[in-house]
C-alpha cells in the first residue's frame, strides 16, 4: 500500500520523453508525440493551462496519420505552422501535406528536415510546440542534447 504523498512524490519524478515534455522554458519549447486530433486536444489543454498562445507549431506527422487533423486543431493557437519530415525512411512525408492544407486555406511552411524546422522556428520569439511521430521526437531530442 502506498500513501498519497509517496504516490505524488514518485509521479513528480516520472520522466516520459516526448509526452508533454518541456524542453526549455525560455524560450518555451514543448514536445509531444501527438499524431491525431484527439490527442492534440490534450496538448491544447496543457498549453491553455500554462498560458501559452501564439505559438510556432512544428508538425512532423506522416501522410498515413492525422496530420491534417492536428494542424486544424492547432491553427487557432498558432502564429505559424511548420511542416517537416523525419529522416526515418519507414514514414512517408511530402509537400502534398502542404498542398492539402492549402486547399482548406490553412497556410503552412514546408521544411525538409527537423533541424531546418527548428532553425526556422527559433528565428522568432514565439513559444514553440513540436508535435510528431516518435522518430521526429527522437530527432528533436538529439538536436537539443547537442546544443
Question: Where are the language model's segments positioned?
Answer:
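Short active-site-adjacent structural elements
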Residues: 39, 66-68, 90-92, 118-120, ...
